[in-house]
């Protein structure tokens, strides 16, 4: 059974062999591919993988002796913008050119590039990770729908509606210099999600099979394509989160971990709005945020580059006197990310919308107390008062109340964390998820 994966990133295992920087995102893809490869003799799956590469000309297989066939010239046959990278880490790998800076744009040339890859690899099944990418739409125009499995991720049709996340109207509409130069203020970012949602809807309509994991993504995708067969497939997360465990005595008291805050949808501003109420009860509370510091500037030049959301966060931090309370950690690899969780007393997700956020799953695997907005598919991951605490999106008073509740009740926090860990080990069971994926592949092939 030949299965071609269509991914939005180059897997770290491939990047390492090519001597290229690895992405910090989508670590669960590596876990899933490792499960397939470790059981290759039993499952009979011959994997291939293709992914967008911004600088296709700079993508060479010369860094590794294991790549076998070597890279094709820039034009593969008569099709420019695609390269066969060779046999890497047990799979045939292909890179193709795509405008990664403008994911809302669809270019017809993508179809030709993917058609070349499909013709070369000859897959029985094409597994597309994410319906929201232009390359997924292009693939549905190349391969018959009965051979296509799309793994549902964020669902941009719904993200577009939630994107502004209750920010003041004038903040959504304003243009700073950076926004003017990039033609990219908050409202325009929202419009880009609208366009991606249109492509996503068309891609889902062109697929015979959909893989999801929440009641929410099942309901939303059904409205787009009621004829597609829906398969339940939970995610296998990064290995380190299965190996370590949160311990109250090892964490910093009243330290909150927030996994990402560089755009409105993630809702960091909600947590900032909640901080005055939290600080009344726990004045030593601090927030640690993974990811880029979009609020930072240390020079006039950097100040001119700050985006509208970054400036809004910075202004709110100053307004509430949080300059010494909010810390940005930068981009973290899995081990450092795990350590950031473990050093914190609780994890908060305040997103305006999520499907099944990996950050919540990772916190649950570690056995951490979790406070999350009750949005999208989150309630398919945890039950309020059982494995975590939920609050209504945007209700910052409730967010502050639930955080203070966990700070003040160590027993409750530990009970919720233990229950969260038990449930997450079922949801994110690597062996079970691998078996489920294999069953889906066999069903499609038959």
Task: List PLM regions with ranges.
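Short hydrophobic beta-strand element within catalytic cores of glycosyltransferases
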Residues: 369-372
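Membrane-proximal helix-turn-helix segments that form the acceptor-binding/catalytic region
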Residues: 173-210, 219, 223
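Aromatic "clamp/platform" in nucleotide-sugar-dependent glycosyltransferases that forms part
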Residues: 352
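N-terminal subdomain of nucleotide-sugar transferases
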Residues: 1-80, 89-92
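Short alpha-helical donor nucleotide-sugar binding micro-motif in glycosyltransferases
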Residues: 118, 339-344
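Conserved donor-binding/catalytic core segment of Leloir-type glycosyltransferases
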Residues: 4, 247-266, 272-275, 287-290
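Nucleotide-activated donor-binding/catalytic signature segment of Leloir-type glycosyltransferases, i.e.
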Residues: 301-331
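Conserved acidic donor-binding segment of nucleotide-sugar-dependent glycosyltransferases
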Residues: 384-385, 389-396, 405-410
């Amino acid at each position: 059974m030949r299965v071609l994966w269509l991914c939005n990133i180059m897997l770290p295992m491939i990047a390492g062999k090519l001597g290229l920087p690895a992405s910090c995102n989508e670590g669960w893809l590596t876990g899933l591919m490792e499960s397939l490869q470790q059981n290759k003799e039993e499952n009979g799956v011959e994997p291939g993988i293709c992914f967008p590469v911004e600088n296709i000309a700079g993508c060479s297989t010369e860094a590794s002796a294991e790549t076998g066939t070597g890279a094709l010239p820039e034009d593969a046959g008569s099709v420019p913008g695609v390269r066969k990278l060779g046999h890497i880490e047990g799979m045939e790998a292909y890179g193709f050119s795509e405008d990664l800076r403008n994911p809302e744009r669809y270019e017809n040339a993508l179809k030709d590039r993917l058609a070349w890859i499909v013709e070369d690899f000859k897959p029985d099944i094409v597994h597309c990770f994410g319906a929201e990418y232009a390359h997924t739409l292009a693939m549905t125009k190349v391969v018959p729908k009965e051979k296509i499995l799309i793994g549902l991720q964020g669902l941009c049709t719904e993200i577009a509606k939630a994107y502004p996340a209750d920010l003041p109207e004038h903040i959504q509409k304003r243009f700073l210099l950076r926004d003017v130069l990039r033609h990219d203020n908050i409202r325009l970012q929202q419009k880009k999600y609208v366009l991606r949602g249109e492509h996503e809807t068309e891609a889902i309509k062109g697929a015979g099979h959909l893989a999801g994991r929440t009641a929410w993504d099942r309901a939303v995708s059904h409205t787009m394509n009621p004829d597609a067969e829906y398969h339940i497939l939970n995610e296998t997360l990064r290995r380190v989160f299965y190996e370590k465990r949160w311990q109250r005595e090892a964490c910093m008291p009243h330290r909150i971990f927030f996994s990402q805050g560089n755009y409105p949808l993630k809702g960091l501003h909600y947590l900032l709005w909640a901080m005055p109420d939290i600080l009344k009860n726990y004045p030593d509370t601090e927030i640690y945020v993974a990811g880029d510091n979009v609020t930072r500037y240390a020079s006039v030049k950097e100040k001119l580059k700050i985006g509208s959301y970054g400036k809004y966060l910075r202004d709110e931090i100053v307004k509430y006197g949080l300059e010494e309370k909010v810390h940005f950690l930068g981009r973290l690899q899995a081990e450092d990310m795990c350590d950031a969780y473990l050093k914190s007393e609780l994890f908060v997700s305040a997103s305006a919308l999520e499907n099944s956020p990996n950050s919540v799953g990772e916190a649950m695997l570690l056995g951490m107390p979790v406070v999350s907005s009750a949005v999208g598919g989150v309630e398919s991951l945890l039950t309020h008062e059982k494995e975590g605490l939920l609050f209504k999106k945007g209700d910052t008073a409730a967010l502050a109340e639930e955080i203070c509740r966990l700070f003040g009740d160590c027993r409750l926090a530990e009970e919720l964390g233990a229950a969260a860990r038990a449930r997450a080990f079922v949801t994110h069971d690597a062996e079970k998820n691998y078996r489920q994926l294999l069953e889906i592949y066999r069903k499609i092939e038959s």
